[in-house]
C-alpha cells in the first residue's frame, strides 16, 4: 500500500497516525523466519509509535484493546533505550525480562530492529533465542530474610528491600 505514491497519500490522509510507514521497508528485507515473528499488532506499533505518547490518542480513537494499548505503552516507554548499544546486550535483555516479561522483551527487540541500525539480523535471532531460553531472574532477598537479620516489619523494611533490589538490578 505504501509503495504506490497515490495510495500512500490516500492512506496518510485517512490515517495520519501511520506516519512511520518507512519502517516497513526494513521488515521486507528480513528473511521469512524473522518476518514471521512480527504479528499485526507489532506491525501497527511500528507504524504509530515514537518517543511521544501519541499512541494513546490512536488507541482511544480506534478503541484498541487494553492488551494492545499496554503493548504500545511498553514499547513507547522504552523507545529511547532502543537506540543505545547497551540495549542489545544479553545482560540488558535479562533485566528487561525481570522488570516486565519475556513477551515484552521480545516485542522491544523486534521493534528495535526496525528503528535502529545498530543491530544485525543475525544478532536479533541470537537474542530472540536467548529470550526464549532465559530463566526469569528471581530477586534472592525477601522480607523474611531481612527480618531475620534485624529489620522490623514496616516502612524501613520496604525501603531497604527496594534499595537492595535497585542495586541488584543495576
Feature locations, PLM:
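Charged substrate- and nucleic-acid-binding regions of tRNA-handling and nucleotidyl-transfer enzymes
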Residues: 2, 107-170
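Conserved, hydrophobic alpha-helical core segments of structured domains
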Residues: 1-121
Amino acid at each position: 500500500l505504501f509503495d504506490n505514491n497515490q495510495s500512500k497519500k490516500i492512506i496518510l490522509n485517512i490515517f495520519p497516525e501511520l506516519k512511520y510507514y518507512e519502517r516497513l521497508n526494513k521488515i521486507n528485507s528480513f528473511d521469512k523466519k524473522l518476518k514471521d515473528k512480527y504479528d499485526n499488532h507489532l506491525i501497527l506499533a511500528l507504524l504509530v509509535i515514537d518517543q511521544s505518547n501519541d499512541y494513546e490518542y490512536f488507541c482511544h480513537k480506534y478503541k484498541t484493546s487494553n492488551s494492545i494499548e499496554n503493548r504500545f505503552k511498553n514499547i513507547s516507554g522504552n523507545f529511547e533505550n532502543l537506540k543505545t548499544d547497551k540495549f542489545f546486550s544479553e545482560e540488558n535483555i535479562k533485566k528487561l525480562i525481570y522488570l516486565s516479561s519475556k513477551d515484552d522483551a521480545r516485542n522491544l527487540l523486534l521493534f528495535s530492529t526496525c528503528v535502529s541500525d545498530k543491530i544485525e539480523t543475525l544478532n536479533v535471532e541470537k537474542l530472540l533465542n536467548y529470550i526464549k531460553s532465559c530463566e526469569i531472574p528471581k530477586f534472592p532477598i525477601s522480607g523474611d530474610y531481612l527480618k531475620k537479620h534485624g529489620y522490623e516489619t514496616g516502612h524501613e523494611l520496604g525501603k531497604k528491600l527496594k534499595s537492595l533490589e535497585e542495586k541488584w538490578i543495576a
